[in-house]
A protein has these predicted regions:
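Extreme N-terminal basic, low-complexity initiation segments
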Residues: 2-8
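Terminal targeting signals and extreme-terminal segments of soluble enzymes
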Residues: 16-326, 332-338, 342-367
Length: 367
């Protein structure tokens, strides 16, 4: 039975809150498309549910793929960055949704490795082709290819595992930071920056551009820099992040897909923090993206995202015998214009970013 439930709209800028919500349209995907675990996820990370009963737009729209055939799905776009290229997190999240639909309910993703091979076209949908590489008793591997205009734009390998106990356990300690309730949200922080009369025009333009974007996630920066610190920043940052709206406890696979979406937002910019004052970024793209999932979590509850960039430079020179082992690593490339208008155009720079997603109870959930 359908009935309508009023939902208060917080602001005219928030496209993810609507005036009326038809509950019959907001239910979880039907049994054929449901990716939830048969057991409800015990919520240990705290923080409570977001207010209201509005289903997260990440579940109802962004990550709700249309099945076309067995192991073939179509995804549409919800938010397109100002670069007019497809958001990398959307492609990763949708690809993981497609892969997760091809495995049993009792197995969950533990790692994925992705390559972005072409720029995505925001004017057309994306087709996701799943190959069942291996289905074993404990582990299953799926290959996903995202296609536009008959050519792959993205390839991904995802590994799934049955939940099994482990006698060996350890982890780093979560950084000691203020809780999200003590911090300004993204919108309030931007307004604070814009109210400073000493803010340089290039920062003002960039902040206004960010403020105009409508994204289905919420962010609160930890120790946000002052205006005077913007020109002298290290390549590391931390912020609390969660999906807008409600996802629920039991859908473990969907929480992983939402985390894959969120993992690419504000992540790559970590490598540029020490350089923005000196160079104008022409464009920046992901080259590859890897994730490891360690423990159940809720992506609609606040999680601490710890990001750092240990290296940026150019490709070349002799190969070093050392090996770089990274966590939550993403390799990116960008082209830059030096701040001087008389300098030559340069490009080909690359950077590496590591990240960790912590539950607020101190458990390392994703890296």
């Amino acid at each position: 039975r359908r009935r309508e439930l009023p939902v208060t709209r917080k602001s005219c800028r928030n496209l993810f809150r609507v005036d009326r919500l038809v509950l019959g349209q907001a239910q979880v995907l039907d049994r054929e498309n449901d990716m939830s675990s048969p057991q409800s996820l015990e919520d240990e990370q705290g923080g409570g549910d977001p207010p209201g009963d509005l289903r997260s737009v990440l579940v109802t729209s962004v990550l709700n793929l249309e099945p076309l055939d067995e192991d073939l799905f179509r995804g549409r776009h919800y938010w397109v960055p100002t670069t007019q290229r497809l958001f990398g997190g959307q492609i990763v999240g949708q690809a993981l949704v497609a892969a997760a639909k091809s495995v049993n309910e009792d197995v969950h993703v533990h790692s994925l490795h992705c390559y972005f091979v072409r720029a995505g076209d925001p004017k057309v949908p994306v087709l996701y082709q799943v190959e069942r590489t291996r289905t074993g008793a404990s582990f299953s591997v799926r290959s996903v290819k995202a296609v536009q205009h008959g050519k792959p734009i993205f390839i991904c390998q995802a590994s799934f595992q049955k939940v099994q106990p482990s006698p060996v356990q350890h982890q780093f300690s979560m950084p000691r930071v203020p809780f999200p309730e003590e911090l300004l949200d993204h919108e309030a922080l931007i307004e604070q920056y814009l109210s400073d009369p000493n803010l340089q025009e290039k920062y003002r333009v960039g902040l206004n551009r960010i403020a105009a974007q409508e994204v289905p996630i919420e962010i609160k920066l930890v120790n946000p820099p002052t205006v005077s610190q913007l020109q002298n920043m290290e390549p590391r940052q931390m912020f609390w992040v969660r999906a807008r709206g409600y996802i629920g406890e039991g859908d473990i696979k969907m929480h992983c897909c939402v985390a894959a979406y969120m993992s690419d937002y504000a992540f790559l910019g970590t490598a540029l923090l020490p350089h923005r004052w000196q160079h104008q970024v022409h464009f920046m793209v992901s080259l590859d993206h890897s994730m490891w999932f360690h423990t159940p979590f809720r992506a609609d509850h606040w999680m601490l995202y710890e990001c750092e960039s240990p290296w940026a430079g150019e490709y070349g020179g002799e190969w070093d015998q050392g090996t770089d082992f990274g966590v939550a690593e993403s390799l990116l490339s960008w082209e830059i214009r030096p701040s001087s208008p008389f300098s030559l155009y340069t490009g080909g720079s690359r950077g590496l970013v590591h990240g960790r997603l912590w539950r607020r109870d101190g458990v390392l959930a994703v890296s």
